[in-house]
Structures are given as structure tokens and as C-alpha cells.
């Protein structure tokens, strides 16, 4: 996830290719970061963990986020779960920023630029749970492979491996780079939470 994080500033997810950037969700942080973040991760003080509000009203604590120093582009992703303990996995999808973030135990372990539904076939927003997993799914409706599919709705909306190119869209699904889809599939389980924020 590309995070604009300054001392006392809000967490803001930003797709740096797009301008002007508009944060779909901002959280005020009262924690003070004594030095500029370095390394692969930005850690927050246990006394001042930021919280993300989800569409269903639930709040999730954020203990650390990936420190992504370079701009992310269509097709790019970051994954780093080194030294992150096992824990509950949940996924945050920000359609406005075209970013998907994976959290485990409150720590962001992955972030990817996504493609999503077009105006004629929009991606639904709200809070969902993973209903089904299929590493080698093939859609009969669209006559297309959907590798590492994580189904979110009964009518077929899912997160799956896809080419992620600027200007591309899906029929409502969330497309992520294939290697990222494989890693997400390896940690996500049936019943895990997925929050989709509107564009």
C-alpha cells in the first residue's frame, strides 16, 4: 500500500499514478513517529494504533503497514509477511484508489493495484466474507479463467488473478496480478472479511 504518513498525519491510501488523489478513508493518528520510516514496514505505537472503519461499522486495528517508497503502477504489487505472526486475515479494497491491501493480525502484508467493474457491471461495495475458494476456477458465464478465485457474492463477484492494465475493467470482479492472487489465496480462508470501499 502506498501510504502518505507524516508525523500526526492521517493514513491515506494513494495510487500515485492518479492525480489529484482523494482518500476514500482517512484516520487521524495521534501517534508520533520519531524518525522518518525506513525499512519495509511502518510500525505504530501500541498506545496509538490507528483504526480503520469498515462499511459495516466494524473497526480494525492497524499495527503496521508496508513502507512502499516508490509509486505503484498498474500490474505492480508488494508482498512482505516476514516476521508477521499468524492471525486473522482481512482484505481492504479501495475502488477510488484502485488498491487492495491484505492485513493479518493488524499488519499489512500485501498491497496491489487492481482493476474492477465498469459502469455497466459495477463492483459492489460493502462488507463481504469469502464464500468459496478455487485455485483453478474457470467462469462458464464469461468463458474465461479466473485463477486463485475468492468468491464474495452468490452471483459470482470474486477476487481473482488477472492482467491489470490501465483502462481495463472487469464485469464486477476485482482483478489482481496473478502472482499476488496466488499469495493472497495462500493466506485467505473461507469466511475471511473483505471490505470494498466505493469509487
Per-range role (PLM):
Residues 1-149, 155, 162-174, 178-199:
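N-terminal pre-domains immediately preceding structured catalytic cores
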Amino acid at each position: 500500500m502506498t501510504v502518505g504518513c507524516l508525523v500526526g498525519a492521517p493514513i491515506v491510501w494513494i495510487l500515485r499514478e492518479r492525480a489529484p488523489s482523494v482518500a476514500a478513508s482517512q484516520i487521524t493518528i495521534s501517534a508520533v513517529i520519531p524518525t522518518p520510516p525506513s525499512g519495509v514496514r511502518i510500525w505504530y505505537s501500541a498506545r496509538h494504533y490507528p483504526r480503520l472503519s469498515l462499511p459495516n461499522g466494524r473497526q480494525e486495528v492497524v499495527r503496521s503497514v508496508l513502507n512502499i517508497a516508490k509509486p505503484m503502477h498498474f500490474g505492480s504489487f508488494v508482498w512482505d509477511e516476514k516476521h508477521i505472526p499468524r492471525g486473522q486475515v482481512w482484505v481492504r479494497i479501495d475502488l477510488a484508489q484502485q488498491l487492495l491491501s491484505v492485513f493479518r493480525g493488524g499488519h499489512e502484508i500485501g498491497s496491489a493495484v487492481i482493476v474492477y467493474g465498469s459502469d455497466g457491471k459495477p463492483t459492489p461495495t460493502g462488507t463481504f466474507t469469502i464464500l468459496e475458494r478455487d485455485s483453478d476456477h474457470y467462469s462458464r458465464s464469461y468463458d474465461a479463467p479466473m485463477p486463485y478465485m475468492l468468491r464474495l457474492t452468490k452471483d459470482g463477484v470474486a477476487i481473482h488473478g488477472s492482467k491489470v492494465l490501465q483502462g481495463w475493467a472487469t464485469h464486477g470482479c476485482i482483478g489482481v496480478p496473478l502472482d499476488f492472487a496466488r499469495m493472497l489465496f495462500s493466506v485467505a480462508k473461507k469466511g475471511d472479511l473483505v471490505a470494498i470501499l466505493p469509487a
